[in-house]
Amino acid sequence: MADVNKVVLAYSGGLDTSVILKWLQDTYNCEVVTFTADLGQGEEVEPARAKAQAMGVKEIYIDDLREEFVRDFVFPMFRANTVYEGEYLLGTSIARPLIAKRLIEIANETGADAISHGATGKGNDQVRFELGAYALKPGVKVIAPWREWDLLSREKLMDYAEKHNIPIERHGKKKSPYSMDANLLHISYEGGVLEDTWTEHEEDMWRWTKSPEDAPNVATYLELTYRNGDIVALDGVDMTPATVLATLNRIGGENGIGRLDIVENRYVGMKSRGCYETPGGTIMLRAHRAIESITLDREVAHLKDELMVKYASLIYTGYWWSPERLMLQQMIDASQVHVNGVVRLKLYKGNVIVTGRKSDDSLFDANIATFEDDAGAYDQADAAGFIKLNALRMRIAANKGRKLF
């Protein structure tokens, strides 16, 4: 790579990125700017400042991005009822474009000519970070140490850290056997026993949710108020986007909601098993579909479902900043103008049950849909012509002797 003068590093303060920090300083003889994001991962971010200072970093960014994350990334994604491969709520995927955006903003502010991240060469995150970076700053240099160095085991990283006096904790609390990623939307677990697809996940792995068997024996009722497709209040109390999600995480976790054990297809080609806890997101998805069920036109709803598969794939594979994702987002957002109202849910032992939905913009007409006398609101005789017209092409084919089986 051409000469690098200053690098902005996505820095957590953990072993991997602390080693990367020193490795960048030594390998490229460059100045390193650290960026640590608070996305609601539930860990203290300030210790990263002390570690960076101890390693000679002069420019340190620690940003609370929780509101921006939920408002500008999570909520827009949930307007589309987004699910990857039928199950995954994209908790890791949706955080990466925001981190990439902030890396580029800091690079512009500090005059850095490169960015760096700690994603490995096997995963999706390297693609997500770098596609976002190139979309926002085409000429930026990207340094991905895991694709360059030979420190390919935790033990080698530990040895490197000790050799270079990098402040780490070799002894202390027991390290989790899983590779984990967390933000306000979810926490994920990979590796360890999960690499055997037949081995059941361990109960003590889960951090956010109670086991459904241990959840309360009494159901929790909850009302979610929607405006233009986004939740603006819980049980009538107005809340910011981040507060909404944090509250739903807490309530959902207490009721054993949001656990998932899946094998997904990574963009780089391999299959990967992961376990996820997404309590708030699971509640949001069910509630959003419920409010849309009474406020969206049928064909708009069906078209949204068709587009969602592509939209989910774009987010999963790192194309959040692509023109096609932006185009789809405009269509999705336009569909949400009338998605207003209240959804009532019952949460019970891992289940999210819709018990009511209402809206001033509802397209549900009880006078037409009733099983009782509709007083002439709907003429059932009209159905005969409707059915004959829709059967016409099949009748023609049958008259021609076309066989169906």
Curated annotation (Swiss-Prot):
Gene Ontology terms: biological process: argininosuccinate metabolic process; L-arginine biosynthetic process; urea cycle
SUPFAM superfamilies the record matches: Adenine nucleotide alpha hydrolases-like (SSF52402), Argininosuccinate synthetase, C-terminal domain (SSF69864)
EC number(s) on file: 6.3.4.5
Compartment annotation: Cytoplasm
Signal peptide: none
Oligomeric and partner information: Homotetramer.
The name this protein goes by in its record: Argininosuccinate synthase
Annotated source species: Pseudomonas syringae pv. tomato (strain ATCC BAA-871 / DC3000)
